[in-house]
Structure formats: C-alpha cells, structure tokens
C-alpha cells in the first residue's frame, strides 16, 4: 500500500507516476473523499471545542443556581453530532483504504517505459545456447519418452495441468531442490524456513495478492477461510507482520521450499502443455527484510543469488529488467531471469526478483527500530525465486538431452543423484 499522505498532498503527481504503468488513478474519487475528510475534521474539532466550552458553562451556571437543563440538552446534542461525524470519518477512512488496496506500487525511476514484455530491457546474458546436430525435443516428449512423466494419470487424479513424476525424474526434481537449498543456506547466508501451505486472507492482503488477484488463488471452502499459497513469499514475508524488528537482526534472509498453487485463470497457448504452467508446482523462494537504505543493493544481491544456481547447472540465461507496464502490482522494480529452452527456441522466465520497498511493509505493519531515532519505521521487503523447481527441471531436460533422448545430469547434481550421471535406457 502506498503512503496515504501522497493522496492528500501530491495527488496529481502520484497519478502521473502511476500512469507509467498504464494505471488510471481515480483522482476524482480520492479528491472528493479527501475534501470531505478535511471538512469533517474541521467541523468535528469545532464541535469538540463548543462542547468543551458548554460543559464548562454548566458548572458555572450550576454554581450560580441557574437552570442547567437547556445547557445539558445542548451538550447532548453536540455529542450526538460528534458521534455522527466520527462514524462518517470512519466510513471515509474505510472507503479510502479500499481504494488504496487497489492501487499498485510506484516504480523506481530507472524502470524503463513500456507497456508489455516486448518493451523489457535485456541487461546481460550468460552462457551460449547448446548447438545440437539433431532436432532437439521439448521437455514433454523427453519426459514421456523416458517413462517418467504421466500426464494422463495426473488428469485422472486431479484434472489438467498436473503431472505425476516417477523414478529418476522425481529424484532429479528432489536433487534440484536440495542443491538450491544447500547453496542458498551454505553460501548465500539464508535461513531455511518451513511454513504452512494454507494461509488466511490477512496474509494475502499483506503481500498484495488480495483483494485484486483473488481469481488466481485456490480458496478452501472451510471455516475459517484458508487459501493455498501461490508462492512462499506470502507466509515467509508475513513472518514480520505486526512486528518491530530490532536493527541488529537486519537483514533477515529466508529461503523456503514449498509447493505453490495457482488457478492460472486466463492463461492459454503453448504453456498449457507440459510443466511450464501448472496448477501445482514447486519453488525455492528467497525473501529478504532489510533497512530502507539497503534495499537497492539487496535487490542486486538477491538476483545474483538466483543467477548462481543457473550458472552452476550450466544453463544459459539472460537477465531482463521489466518495463513499467510489465512490472507486478506490488513491485517497485523487477528483474526476470529467463533460461534458454531449446524445445521452444526461446528464453523463458525461471525467476522473478523484486524490490517492493515499503509497499508490502505498510500493509503488514512490518517495522524496524531505527537506533538513530529510537522510533519504529517501515522495513523494505524483497523476494525472488531461487529457482522455480519445475521450470529448472524443464531447462535441464531440454539443454542436457542427447539424440537418443537421454539426459546428462549436471555435474553438481550427481552427488544428489547417488552417482547417476545419465538418465535414459542405456544409463
């Protein structure tokens, strides 16, 4: 959530900045609410002053032996008007907060202009796409050919956009997860965290998924209401909700492996087939809670931590800075890491690393105690995938295939595979 003061003192400038995203701020609605709020506050203050004055008069009139009933009636009437004003002020505040929940974050100044992913800016590339002397298969043909992926069985169990992995591919997915966790905890200084996969609505409001993106969530029909997590970002970031973190504890760096659940409402096309876009998938998520002055540097570091995984696996990728129109609702700045997929002959997103500045923290009331002032101030929050496990599995299958449809296991994963370095019939 943006600072409400922006809508009181810098409404037009805030609207202009939000316009970079293609978001049209309803300045008339905000302006009307603000004008009414200010008028009510002035009126309420005047009523309070008048009530206080008349209350003093009651004591003086009583001391003089005068009839105080008219004064008591007047004070009672003022009290009723004050209650009405206070109720209207509370209503205005609720309406203002409801509007604010639908307003995205302001973008950093170095986020490029643009409306769609076509306007994103490539920052750099690492590695060269493999050159095959045969027509490379996509991950679906490879996985099914190995007899280790069963989409029909998954459809029988759950429906479309699910998969059953067995044998060496199930183990390869586990190996990828363990490898990522080991690097992030052992080399990058993250604390491994296990969290609930069901969360309440307050948690999703805190990180920005609610109310705007409810259709993307799986809601459990139960009392109390729960939602399946769309990403570990939600429960992990909410660990600091309503907390004041002491300065010496910062930065907080968490890594968390969870399944993720998304309805993928409205998605279609090539990603409906295979493992790229499923209702249930796994991620290793990186979350950082930092001092405001450290968030820009932390964003670069977190993105680099995700890149290290790709490089250790030998997977070609590129870093892309998202343009204004493609940056997510809660983010001030986002880098996407896109891995090369030979089966699609294109780079596809495998990690999204974002700096939210104080946008989530204001919703969460997540604060730190500034030692210079002794007062609580909002933290900055960041997160990114380190990496999406299923998409990393896809990238390994497609980049490490041979003509026979076998898969060469990346060297760093061989110990996690019990020494197996080749997956396939002749392995």
Curated annotation (Swiss-Prot):
CDD domains reported for this sequence: SerRS_core
EC number: 6.1.1.11
Catalyzed reaction equations: tRNA(Ser) + L-serine + ATP = L-seryl-tRNA(Ser) + AMP + diphosphate + H(+); tRNA(Sec) + L-serine + ATP = L-seryl-tRNA(Sec) + AMP + diphosphate + H(+)
GO biological process entries: selenocysteine biosynthetic process; seryl-tRNA aminoacylation
PROSITE patterns for the chain: AA_TRNA_LIGASE_II
One of the record's GO cellular component terms: cytoplasm
Record-stated family: Belongs to the class-II aminoacyl-tRNA synthetase family. Type-1 seryl-tRNA synthetase subfamily.
Domain remarks: Consists of two distinct domains, a catalytic core and a N-terminal extension that is involved in tRNA binding.
Protein name: Serine--tRNA ligase
Organism: Methylococcus capsulatus (strain ATCC 33009 / NCIMB 11132 / Bath)
């Amino acid at each position: 959530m943006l600072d409400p003061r922006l809508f009181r003192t810098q409404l037009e400038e805030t609207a202009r900045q939000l316009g970079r995203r293609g978001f049209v701020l309803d300045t008339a609605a905000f302006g009307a609410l603000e004008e009414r709020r200010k008028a009510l506050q002035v009126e309420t203050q005047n009523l309070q002053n008048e009530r206080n004055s008349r209350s003093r008069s009651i004591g003086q009139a009583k001391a003089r032996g005068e009839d105080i009933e008219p004064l008591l009636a007047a004070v009672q009437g003022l009290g009723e008007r004050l209650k009405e004003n206070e109720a209207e002020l509370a209503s205005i505040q609720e309406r203002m907060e409801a509007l604010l929940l639908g307003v995205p974050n302001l973008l950093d100044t170095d986020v490029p202009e643009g409306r769609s992913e076509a306007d994103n800016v490539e920052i750099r590339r690492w590695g060269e796409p493999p050159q095959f002397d045969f027509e490379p298969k996509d991950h679906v043909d490879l996985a099914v050919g190995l007899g280790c992926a069963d989409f029909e069985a998954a459809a029988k169990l759950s429906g479309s956009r699910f998969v059953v992995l067995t044998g060496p591919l199930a183990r390869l997915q586990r190996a990828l997860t363990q490898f990522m966790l080991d690097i992030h905890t052992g080399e990058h200084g993250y604390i491994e965290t296990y969290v609930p996969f069901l969360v309440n609505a307050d948690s999703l409001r805190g990180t920005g998924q609610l109310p705007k993106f409810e259709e993307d969530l799986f809601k459990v029909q139960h009392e109390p209401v729960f939602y399946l997590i769309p990403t570990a970002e939600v429960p992990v970031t909410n660990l600091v909700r309503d907390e004041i973190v002491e300065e010496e504890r910062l930065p907080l760096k968490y890594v968390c492996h969870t399944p993720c659940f998304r309805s993928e409402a409205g998605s279609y096309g090539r990603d409906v087939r295979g493992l790229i876009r499923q209702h249930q998938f796994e991620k290793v998520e990186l979350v950082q809670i930092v001092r405001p002055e450290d968030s820009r540097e932390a964003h670069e570091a977190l993105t680099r931590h995700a890149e290290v995984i790709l490089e250790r696996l030998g997977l070609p990728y590129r870093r892309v800075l998202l343009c204004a129109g493609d940056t997510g609702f809660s983010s001030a700045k986002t880098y996407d890491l896109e891995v090369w997929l030979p089966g699609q002959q294109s780079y596809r997103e495998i990690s999204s690393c974002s700096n939210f500045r104080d946008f989530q923290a204001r919703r969460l009331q997540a604060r730190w105690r500034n030692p210079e002032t002794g007062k609580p101030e909002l933290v900055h929050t960041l997160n990114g995938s380190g990496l999406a496990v299923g998409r990393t599995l896809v990238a390994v299958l497609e980049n490490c295939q041979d003509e026979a449809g076998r898969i060469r296991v990346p060297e760093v994963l061989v110990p996690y595979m019990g020494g197996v370095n080749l997956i396939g019939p002749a392995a």
